[in-house]
Amino acid sequence: LYVHGNHDECYADTPPEGCICIDDCLYEYQGLRILGLGGSMRYRPGDFQYTQKEMTWRIRKLWFKIRRKKGFDLLVTHSPAKGLGDGEDLPHQGFDAFRDLLDKYAPPFFIHGHMHLNYGRSKRISQYQQTIIVNAFEKYVIECPVPE
């Protein structure tokens, strides 16, 4: 499973093989509800970059599905949430709307990328209220219990 990053313009024509894009989806796997939202803060012209308002609108379009499934277990994004492992410069600022999702639905896990650990600004694992936040930059294995 994957969501688009800010440098994934080539995926519009040639998506990666052997995986499923969950961008703008509430994907369910063996009872595990996974909400996918790719992209970063808009800092230049290009695909998969959004303003705060655009990201909020993307989430609003998924609201009925989220409500019907009674929330989600994993939030998978490219960018972090605002104030939770993000940076100060525009390309690395997080989205307010992601933090709003964490506040409203309290998923067990929030998995994001974009914040390269060699930047020295971000921890691999952190916690926000009841949600474990994982910066999955490069790769990271997470064992997540499947709901009964």
Sequence positions of predicted segments:
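Binuclear metal-dependent phosphoesterase catalytic core
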Residues: 28-30, 99-105, 109, 117-148
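Conserved catalytic scaffold of divalent metal-dependent phosphoesterases
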Residues: 6-97
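Active-site environment of divalent metal-dependent phosphoester hydrolases
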Residues: 3-13, 42-46, 81-85, 108-126, ...
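Active-site neighborhood of phospho(di)ester-bond hydrolases with catalytic His/Asp-centered motifs
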Residues: 1-6, 22-23, 74-78, 102, ...
